[in-house]
């Protein structure tokens, strides 16, 4: 099996569709089908900040239930799940945009979207090991020694939030260690979470969150070819959102 892993979408539905079509998938059946039997994998953070978060949820949720694509959640997915469960969460860092979309829907549509997303999240693995162990997909990455472990405790925290130090930057974002610079595992780890201007490939890892929602690009990693494809964002570019790894 060959895979195309798509990075953080954050509600950029139009760019997602454009990238899927650029990768050679047909959408005539309503779900992505590739003539060479490739499979799409979504890297989490489907929603928040962008203009069409719930359209992304509908597309990915239905495609996963159809068996056409794979999905692992990100930290924004985790927070949206807690919001839909009725847990106390702060409507900030983009969740407020998804919540506004949701509240503008008719009641039945709200229920349908909520139920679809909750099924999607509850059935999803926190990280995926694919291609006979040669490819690992984890939203914020994973240490070599943790591949194969149950995603609980520190492993769960890592795959959702990265290698955080507990400290914060002046803008409130967490300080993260550059785990990829020290990765020495054999499997390729595909991750996102931290926006970078260009895909960062180092030591069998690649960060493909190229900040589509911040006006840059939406990127996919093709495996086993080890190549990338991307489409430009339609949103305004925000230089302040991009920083050097980690």
Swiss-Prot record:
Q: Does the keyword Acyltransferase apply?
A: no
What GO MF terms are annotated?
bis(5'-nucleosyl)-tetraphosphatase (asymmetrical) activity; GTP binding; nickel cation binding; phosphatase activity
What GO terms fall under cellular component here? cytoplasm
Top-rank taxon, per record = Bacteria
Q: Which cofactor does it need?
A: Ni(2+)
Per UniProt, the keywords (alphabetical) are:
GTP-binding, Hydrolase, Nickel, Nucleotide-binding
EC number(s) for this protein? 3.6.1.17
Catalyzed reactions per annotation: P(1),P(4)-bis(5'-guanosyl) tetraphosphate + H2O = GMP + GTP + 2 H(+)
**Is this entry keyworded DNA damage?**
no
**Which function does this protein serve?**
Asymmetrically hydrolyzes Ap4p to yield AMP and ATP.
Family label: Belongs to the PrpE family.
**The name this protein goes by in its record:** Bis(5'-nucleosyl)-tetraphosphatase PrpE [asymmetrical]
């Amino acid at each position: 099996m060959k895979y195309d892993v798509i990075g953080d979408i954050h509600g950029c539905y139009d760019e997602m569709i454009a990238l899927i079509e650029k990768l050679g998938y047909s959408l005539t059946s309503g779900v992505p089908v590739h003539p060479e039997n490739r499979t799409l994998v979504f890297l989490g953070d489907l929603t928040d900040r962008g203009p069409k978060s719930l359209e992304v949820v509908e597309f990915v949720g239905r495609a996963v239930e159809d068996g056409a694509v794979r999905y692992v959640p990100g930290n924004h997915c985790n927070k949206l799940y807690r919001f839909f469960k009725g847990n106390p969460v702060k409507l900030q860092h983009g969740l407020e945009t998804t919540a506004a979309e949701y509240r503008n829907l008719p009641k039945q549509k709200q229920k349908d979207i909520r139920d679809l997303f909750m099924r999607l999240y509850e059935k999803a693995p926190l990280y995926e090991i694919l291609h006979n162990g040669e490819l690992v997909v984890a939203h914020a990455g994973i240490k070599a020694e943790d591949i194969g472990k149950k995603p609980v405790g520190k492993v769960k925290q890592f795959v959702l939030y990265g290698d955080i130090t507990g400290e914060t930057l002046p803008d409130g974002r967490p300080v993260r260690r550059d785990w990829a610079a020290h990765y020495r595992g054999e499997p390729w780890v595909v991750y996102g979470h931290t926006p970078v201007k260009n895909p960062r490939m180092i030591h069998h890892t690649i960060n493909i969150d190229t900040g589509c929602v911040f006006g840059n690009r939406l990127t996919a990693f093709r495996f086993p070819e080890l190549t990338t494809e991307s489409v430009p964002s339609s949103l305004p570019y925000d230089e302040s959102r991009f920083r050097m790894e980690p």
